[in-house]
Amino acid sequence: MNVYYEQDADLGFLQGKNIAVLGYGSQGHAHALNLKDSGMNVCVGLRSDSTSCQKARDAGLEVKTIADAVTWADIVMVLLPDQNQKAIYEAEIAPNLVPGNTLAFAHGFNIHYKQIIPQETINVIMIAPKSPGHLVRRTFTQGNGVPCLIAVHQDYTGEAKQQALAWAKGLGGTKAGVIETTIKNETETDLFGEQAVLCGGSAELIKAGFETLVEAGYPEELAYFECMHELKLIVDLYYEGGLSRMNYSVSDTAEYGGMTRGPRLITPAVKAEMKKILEEVQDGRFAREFIDECQNGYPNLNRLREENRTHSIEKVGARLREMMSWLIKK
């Protein structure tokens, strides 16, 4: 696996070019501001009625409609929600691209699953910071950066990889390290991680643990602390130093209990189900299911959101978080 640093990237591959960042959310604001502060000529492309227009202007960025931004730009970074990209690409992006332009993404969903099929006469690249946008921005302003992934899907001009590296450098990523991958590998591992571990597996494990304690007669408050609240303490240890750091930091009782009981939960049957989930990502079944869900108005997602919203762990959690002065109330 190739890893690149400061000396491997040249901002000259972006200098003198017009750069459009479409979207001004978590990633969009970080990409636009970091590249602007790196000396690039940047505009933000948004719907004319977007509430983000004024935020971008207040940050010193030029704002254009999406179509105008694409027409103006040499390099276009698409940082719009996955489910919106296809329609916007067909209506406002594709008609305004010209040969030699570069189309960039921070996630490969629409390219990998062929929701977007770019013309052959442009570069298509991916630059994916491995952190939320606020951290991309904060580390940059501190003179550092976060690790990034890059990939080249199409190289029409012969400069696609150099442009991807330059973009990563403009974000601050080459100070941490930039890993070269493929659109396929980024997309499939990202979706699997979200579904099996980060957003799906962990949430279901939390709820199952909470329900087990409550059904056994323990107070909801104690169940919340043990199965939800304290998870952050453990995840922070994983984040800082891996499994070994966590095991070193907890009590011997916790370490022994975790190592001997954990495998009874995550059995070969669980891993077999993980493999099925991965297969659904790999063969496109999940993508087709999600696209159909979006086109039908999110009936399943809305139902599942309501089930989660009304789960008792949410109600007791809301009460307990009122006791935590260090939390930012939203």
Swiss-Prot record:
Protein name, per record: Ketol-acid reductoisomerase (NADP(+))
Pathway: Amino-acid biosynthesis; L-isoleucine biosynthesis; L-isoleucine from 2-oxobutanoate: step 2/4; Amino-acid biosynthesis; L-valine biosynthesis; L-valine from pyruvate: step 2/4
Primary gene name: ilvC
Molecular function terms, GO-annotated: ketol-acid reductoisomerase activity; magnesium ion binding; NADP binding
Domain KARI N-terminal Rossmann: 1-181
Residues the record lists as binding substrate: S251
Gene3D superfamilies from the UniProt entry: 6.10.240.10, NAD(P)-binding Rossmann-like Domain (3.40.50.720)
UniProt key word Kinase: no
Location of the active site: H107
